[in-house]
């Protein structure tokens, strides 16, 4: 019997396809209402933290160096009030085999795929995760397919995504490059069904749990090196897995560090817009992913996402494109380190936040990534100019995404801007209710939403009262 391969036909089979491609029956975690058993789902990986460390270390993933940025710290202190200016550190995740922290996510997923007998892995990603999956698959002797959203309707590709395709292909993956739009998820599902490969999604428990080793390492390294945990850890935020995994690892280490999410401000640019696709100079760690995925994590390519950042986030800040480009140059010229845009998003935020903190405190940027070719600032700026973006020096707060990139004319103008956390939390609650409009909200649902938002049952009740649902 021929299967219905129309868009609606494939979408009607998505849960079955996902179950076969991941080996997880997500239905067993459901309550039948709003809540589900998140911790039970995370335990579905079947691996302890120690086992995950062993898996990662066996392929050269993890144990990345911690570097103190003394010169950037000194610069921030010159701009800060007397006695302020925390010490700035980075966890150099670019030292992983594929050049980013996502090797940690991929190592677990690929190991599990091979253990279950899958012949290959597939991932839908335009970013560093594709290179990470390709790298780990090559080491494991598995086939690898990466599906990218790369081009606009005119066939013009974003330089950073094209560079990542190059890297994936260099590591042995087959890369399918698609234009912006809903076809990506459709193609992803058809490939999973046709090949029988493992879904190495960013958002499975395997992938998110893999980042727990990063958070755990951070706590152990700083206790040994400085005699205490970091005071603040800044995580570049897009889909939320980076922050979720890091925070869970810190919790397992017993750390009490403040967790700050940082994203590039792309307000006004729609990520699924063909005309706006090439108006941005950042393809990850931006608000176009960060805000939607924070306020409704289950919009991903699995039934229930393991990345649930609002459970762990204490603060959410944004920085502008010009500020990240500036700090990228500053890192290279002052510290002798040339790194890519994702980690430098968090670094721009950390540079600003450090000036609020005492000199004896520690702030850590928990990732770096490789740079080069299309990821480098020069081709990104050339591409922006070709797309009509006004590039100049001035006050970055005057920057309009899709129209201008404004470098700070003085480093004192780099300012992380806080986003209202309660607004995010209320948005998540509203989105959860919208998914289950006919459900009578139970006490367990209230407790679930309190955990989802890192608040209290009283906060959830107040938010529900605001939308006339209680």
Q: What residue ranges belong to the model's regions?
A:
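Buried hydrophobic positions in well-ordered alpha/beta secondary-structure cores of metabolic enzymes
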Residues: 65, 90, 102, 127, ...
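Positively charged, low-complexity intrinsically disordered leader regions
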Residues: 1-119
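Active-site nucleophile and cofactor-binding loops and adjacent substrate-binding regions
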Residues: 94-103, 120-129, 202-208, 234-239, ...
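Alpha-helix C-terminal capping segments
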Residues: 108-117, 131-143, 248-254, 348-358
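Claisen-condensing/thiolase-fold acyl-transfer catalytic domains that form or cleave C-C bonds
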Residues: 237-248, 252, 321-389, 436
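Small/polar-residue-rich loop-to-helix segments that shape phosphate-bearing ligand pockets
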Residues: 145-229, 265, 271-318, 324
């Amino acid at each position: 019997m021929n299967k219905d391969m129309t868009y609606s036909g494939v979408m009607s089979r998505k849960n079955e396809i996902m179950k076969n491609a991941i080996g997880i029956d997500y239905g067993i975690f459901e309550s039948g209402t709003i809540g589900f058993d998140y911790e039970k789902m995370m335990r579905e990986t079947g691996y302890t933290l120690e086992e995950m460390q062993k898996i990662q270390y066996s392929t050269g993933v993890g144990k990345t160096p911690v570097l103190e940025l003394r010169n950037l710290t000194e610069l921030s202190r010159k701009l800060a009030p007397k006695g302020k200016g925390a010490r700035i550190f980075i966890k150099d995740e670019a030292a992983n085999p594929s050049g980013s922290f996502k090797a940690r996510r991929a190592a677990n997923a690929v190991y599990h795929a091979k253990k279950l007998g899958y012949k290959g892995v597939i991932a839908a990603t335009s970013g560093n995760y594709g290179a990470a999956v390709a790298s780990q698959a090559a080491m494991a002797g598995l086939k690898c397919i990466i599906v990218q959203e790369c081009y606009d309707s005119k066939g013009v590709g974003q330089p950073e995504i094209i560079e990542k395709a190059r890297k994936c292909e260099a590591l042995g993956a087959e890369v399918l490059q698609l234009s912006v739009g809903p076809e990506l998820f459709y193609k992803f599902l058809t490939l999973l069904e046709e090949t029988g490969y493992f879904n190495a999604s960013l958002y499975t428990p395997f992938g998110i749990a893999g980042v727990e080793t990063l958070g755990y390492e951070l706590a152990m390294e700083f206790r040994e090196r400085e005699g205490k945990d970091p005071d603040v850890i800044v995580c570049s935020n897009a889909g939320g897995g980076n922050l979720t995994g890091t925070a869970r690892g810190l919790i397992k280490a017993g750390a009490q560090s403040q967790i700050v999410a940082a994203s590039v401000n792309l307000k006004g640019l729609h990520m699924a817009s063909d005309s706006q696709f090439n108006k941005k100079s950042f393809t990850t760690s931006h608000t176009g992913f960060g805000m939607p995925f924070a306020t409704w994590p289950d919009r991903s390519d699995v039934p229930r996402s393991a990345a649930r950042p609002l459970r762990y986030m204490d603060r959410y800040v944004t920085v502008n494109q010009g500020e990240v480009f500036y700090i990228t140059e500053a890192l290279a010229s002052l510290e002798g380190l040339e790194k890519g845009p994702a980690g430098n998003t968090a670094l721009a935020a950390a540079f600003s936040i450090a000036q609020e903190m005492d000199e004896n405190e520690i702030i850590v940027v928990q990732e770096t990534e490789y740079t080069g070719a299309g990821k480098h600032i020069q081709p990104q700026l050339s591409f922006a100019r070709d797309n009509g973006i006004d590039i100049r020096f001035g006050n970055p707060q005057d920057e309009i995404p899709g129209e201008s990139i404004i470098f700070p004319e003085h480093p004192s103008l780099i300012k992380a801007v806080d986003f209202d956390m309660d607004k995010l939390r209320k948005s998540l609650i509203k989105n959860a209710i919208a998914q289950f409009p006919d459900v009578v909200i139970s006490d367990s649902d209230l407790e679930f939403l309190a955990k989802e938002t890192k608040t209290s049952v009283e906060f959830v009740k107040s938010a529900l009262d605001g939308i006339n649902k209680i």
